[in-house]
Amino acid sequence: TFPSIELETAERVAREIGARHEIAQTDQLAIDDFVKNDANRCFHCKTDLYQLLTGLRESHAAAYVVDGTNLDDLGDDRPGLKAAREWGVRSPLVEAELSKTDIRNLAKELGLSNWDKPAAACLSSRIPRGNMITLETLHRVEDAEAVLHREGFRHFRVRNHGDVARIEVAKE
């Protein structure tokens, strides 16, 4: 449930590095445990994703499924990391002992357009735990964040609280 701008960034960076970009379609809203939005929401989402990617890995005769986990992610409570372990997903950035700062510096050295891109989080993370995740709510959050992006803000989140939106903007 990432904003569409993330897909645009992925497509652009794939072109920059000469990688084939393939989109794997998922439907988290079809997963009842995900929609309930409990403390294991990320686990349910990632389990579904890694199951799909494992099938793609096998059909492409690839050796591994990898993710973008880095050293800075390891201290956080991340149910998605548990799913990654269960599915045998490799984390090459962790294996290389790279932090977010290291990754940004390397991306800048390589001339990648996303080297200074703010961290992105799933739109579902903007909905308080226990509140059901719906397509309508996700669209509302994405639309509100798109307005902030068009206005030139870079580091922000819009959190959905029913009929109220809480806008968090970093000092820039």
Question: What name fits each language-model region?
Answer:
Residues E97-L148, G152-G162:
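Mid-to-C-terminal catalytic subdomains of enzymes
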Residues T1, R85, F156, K171-E172:
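Proteins with a high burden of low-complexity, intrinsically disordered sequence enriched in S/T/G/P/A and R
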Residues N160-K171:
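Short, aliphatic-rich beta-strand segments
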Residues T1-E109, R150, A165:
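ATP-dependent adenylation/nucleotidyltransferase module used to activate substrates
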Residues L29, P128-G130, E172:
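A short, flexible beta-alpha/helix-coil linker loop
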